[in-house]
Each structure stands twice: as C-alpha cells, then as structure tokens.
C-alpha cells in the first residue's frame, strides 16, 4: 500500500510549511526555557508555537516515569530533550491540525493493521487511516514499519496526520474519542526513522 499522488503532495506541502518553523524551534527553545522555573508547565507566551499542546514542557507519563523519573523531568535538560523530540506542537495543532470534533465519523476508513503502532518492528506492517472533515477536506495518516530481514533493526514511517488515534471511529461511537483525556486536535506528522532497534 502506497500513498496517492495527492497524499504525497499534501505531505510535501506540510513539510514546506513546517520546516522553517522547525529550524527556528531549535534556535528559540533553548532560550525560551531559560525563562521557565521549576514550577513552569509551559513555555512563555512569546514562544508558545514551540510548546507541546497536550503535555507542555514537562512531558507525558512515559517521559516523566520512564525517562526522567522523580521530578527530573523538570530539569532544563529533560525539558529541552522533550521539546526537541516533540517540536512545534502548538503551531502544528493551531494551523494544520485536525480537530477531532470536526471529523465526519462516517468517512473514517482504515486499511491494513489497526495495531501497527504496537508492532515495534516485530514484522513488516502498515496502516492507512483516511477521513473527511465536515467541510469536505480529506485527511490521512500513513503508518508503516519495515523490518530489515532477521536483524534487530527496522524503519518506522508516519506521514500525514496522527490519525492512528481515531482507528475504529464511527458515528455511533465518536463521543468515546472525545473524552476528557483524549486529544482534541491531531497534529501533522512527517517522521521517518530509518534506524529503530527492536526491543526484545
């Protein structure tokens, strides 16, 4: 399963819009973090584009519990690593993101392995999720993993929008995708990681 020409052009357009902001991100964030104290949850307003819309500067549960436990997630270094890993979240959500409430749930379609994101390189797999917005615009999320033979390495590709979060959405269950803990806006994504290690 490969992307259509229209989908490839959409990825290229999003890339062209976001890459200058991504470059700026690497320059601004180290200085913006200097304006934060240990109790801060977000970057200063003047640097809001570079913040993470869901978890701010201190990371999600995995970041806080596995990577930087016991409050270490609030150090300058942990925050810098988090924001370098999760770049331009507010910009992406505000200007290019998919508002979950605006998705026409009757148009959500899934091709491939709906559990592809849980695969972690165990086998070759993919999932393509497509939908239409209420205004008729089409959106897609393409996730793929390619294992390198019998090695312990694989390639992970995620393009379009982070629509793996709406796999299984229908008109009769859309409300379950809009709970308090669910993401309200799904960001754009163009991530290709050619060297991921399989964890046994």
Q: What function would you assign to each model-found segment?
A:
Residues 1-18, 56, 62-72:
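Compositionally biased, charge-rich terminal segments
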Residues 5-38:
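A hydrophobic membrane-anchoring feature enriched in long, contiguous, low-charge segments
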Residues 32, 101-106, 132, 149:
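Compositionally biased, intrinsically disordered low-complexity segments
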Residues 1-4, 80, 197-200:
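Short intrinsically disordered terminal tails
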Residues 129-200:
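Cytosol-/stroma-facing membrane-proximal "stalk/adaptor" domains immediately downstream
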Residues 38-127:
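Long, solvent-exposed N-terminal ectodomains/accessory regions
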């Amino acid at each position: 399963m490969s992307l259509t020409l229209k989908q490839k052009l959409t990825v290229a357009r999003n890339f062209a819009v976001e890459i200058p902001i991504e470059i700026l991100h690497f320059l601004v964030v180290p200085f913006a973090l200097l304006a934060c104290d240990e109790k801060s949850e977000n970057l200063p307003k003047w640097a809001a584009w570079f913040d993470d819309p869901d978890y701010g500067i201190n990371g999600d549960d995995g970041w806080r519990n596995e990577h930087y436990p016991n409050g270490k997630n609030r150090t300058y270094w942990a925050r810098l690593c988090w924001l370098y890993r999760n770049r331009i979240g507010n910009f992406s959500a505000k200007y290019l993101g998919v508002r979950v409430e605006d998705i026409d749930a009757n148009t959500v379609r899934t091709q491939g392995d709906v559990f592809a994101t849980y695969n972690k390189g165990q086998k070759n797999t993919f999932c393509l999720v497509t939908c239409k917005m209420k205004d008729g615009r089409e959106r897609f999320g393409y996730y793929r993993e390619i294992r390198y033979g019998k090695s312990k390495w694989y390639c992970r590709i995620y393009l379009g929008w982070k629509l793996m979060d709406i796999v299984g959405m229908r008109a009769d269950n859309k409300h379950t995708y809009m709970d308090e803990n669910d993401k309200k806006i799904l960001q754009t994504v163009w991530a290709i990681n050619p060297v991921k290690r399989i964890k046994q």
